[in-house]
């Protein structure tokens, strides 16, 4: 049995989120909490929230044992991009892409 949690439209580049997700993929939930708590990246707070949600979903919806849970899947897909323009010299404008991500975590019980 698996439980999942998704955070959509997170105002952070998927590339930056994937760096943090790579740290916790395949780890036990308790170990992942410890890693995320001391990871000095902004994406760590987002991933921590999603992990807490996934654990709560596993406990409440599927009656899974929290101590046996591990992160089976962790991925960040690209969401819609907010396009902005920055005025530059001599009438030019540079485009700024404010990227968003959809962060998904799947937790399963270890056999």
UniProtKB/Swiss-Prot annotation:
Pfam families reported for this sequence: Ribosomal_L22 (PF00237)
Domain of life: Bacteria
GO cellular component: cytosolic large ribosomal subunit
Keyword Oxidoreductase appears in the UniProt entry: no
A single GO molecular function term of this UniProt record: structural constituent of ribosome
Any one of the GO BP annotations: translation
Family designation: Belongs to the universal ribosomal protein uL22 family.
Subunit-structure text: Part of the 50S ribosomal subunit.
NCBIfam families per the UniProt record, alphabetical: rplV_bact
Protein name: Large ribosomal subunit protein uL22
Annotated gene: rplV
């Amino acid at each position: 049995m698996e439980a999942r949690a998704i955070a959509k439209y997170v105002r952070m580049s998927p590339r930056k989120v994937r760096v943090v997700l790579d740290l916790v993929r395949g780890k036990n939930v308790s170990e992942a909490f410890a890693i995320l708590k001391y990871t000095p990246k902004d994406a760590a707070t987002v991933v921590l929230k999603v992990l807490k949600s996934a654990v709560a979903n596993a406990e409440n919806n599927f009656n899974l044992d929290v101590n046996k849970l591990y992160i089976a899947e962790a991925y960040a897909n690209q969401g819609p991009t907010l396009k902005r323009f920055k005025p530059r010299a001599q009438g030019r404008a540079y485009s700024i892409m404010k990227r968003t991500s959809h962060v998904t975590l799947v937790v399963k019980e270890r056999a």
